[in-house]
Amino acid sequence: MPEVVINGPEGRLEGRYHHSKQENAPVALLLHPHPQHGGTMNNKVVYTLYHAFVRRGFSALRFNFRGVGRSQGIFDRGEGELSDAASALDWLQTYNPNATACWVAGFSFGAWIGMQLLMRRPEIDSFIAVAPPANMFDFGFLAPCPASGLVILGDQDQLVTADAVQRLVTKLMNQRDIRISHRIIPGADHFFQNHLEPLSQAVEQYIAGNQRKRAAVAGR
């Protein structure tokens, strides 16, 4: 799990990268929760997502947004963090020019940034949004949502409301050719304390199902 340095809009961005041994492996970018509330690339949920992708054969990158850890810059209320994510995706694609698929996955604030990146980068094939804070941030930019994905929430989440997430999922599911899987993890709070294993299982099941569908289409 080598440390990497990415040239970001405001200076260096600190990251951790796993390069798959598989030729032309798919890639995944992982985005951490709110920088001003202790969010880092080493967050347990982000770490869990990262290793779920690694186990499914992906080349995966997680990094610290500006002002977090050894990443340069200061918090920019989402706008700068979106630019950071775009730079990280550029880096990931530079080292994986023949990747068979491109995913973005984020937790909480990171899910909000990831969905915005999804709108700007048509090469992103799918997404995973864990506890997307639909009751705190505006997700109205998803009009229309350009890719299918997975939304996960714990039923004991104390920060993100189930009603707000359900409205977001319903909005996305009403769009043509977009398929949204919505998973509820029983007993899990916002940080999935003592529930990281069922989170990992849900993510890996979704990724595996997506990979099977892609393989079936390619084999026709």
Task: Show where each model-derived region lies.
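Short alpha-helix in the alpha/beta-hydrolase fold that links the catalytic acid
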Residues: 161-171
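Short beta-strand/loop motif that positions the catalytic acidic residue
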Residues: 145, 151-153, 157
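Acidic catalytic loop of the alpha/beta-hydrolase fold
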Residues: 155-160, 190-191
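Catalytic active-site module of serine/aspartate enzymes centered on a nucleophile-bearing elbow/loop
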Residues: 196-220
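Primarily recognizes the serine-hydrolase "nucleophile elbow" in alpha/beta-hydrolase
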Residues: 85-147
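Serine-hydrolase catalytic machinery in alpha/beta-hydrolase-like enzymes
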Residues: 6-96
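Catalytic histidine neighborhood in serine/cysteine hydrolases
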Residues: 172-191
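Catalytic histidine-centered segment of alpha/beta-hydrolase-like enzymes
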Residues: 73, 188-200
